[in-house]
Amino acid sequence: MSQVSVTINGRQFRMACEDGQEGYLMNLAHEIDNRINGLRSKSGRISDIGLIVMLAITLADELAEARQRI
């Protein structure tokens, strides 16, 4: 197992992943960070939990749409 340090919403998190998956995990974290920053810029003042909920709903919607296309 490897350990990776990622930054999301200005906070650092240490996460475990399989050996060789470090770059993949870092790319996922970067995508999440970009999306949170985008939501923040569109939503103005919103709490961290509000951002997380908005992102979770957005991702769930994207997943549902992808499943319908299959």
Which stretches of residues belong to each language-model region?
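An amphipathic alpha-helical micro-motif enriched in hydrophobic residues
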Residues: 52-62
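Basic helix-turn-helix/winged-helix DNA-binding cores
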Residues: 1-29
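Amphipathic, hydrophobic secondary-structure cores in small proteins
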Residues: 5-6, 12-13, 42-54
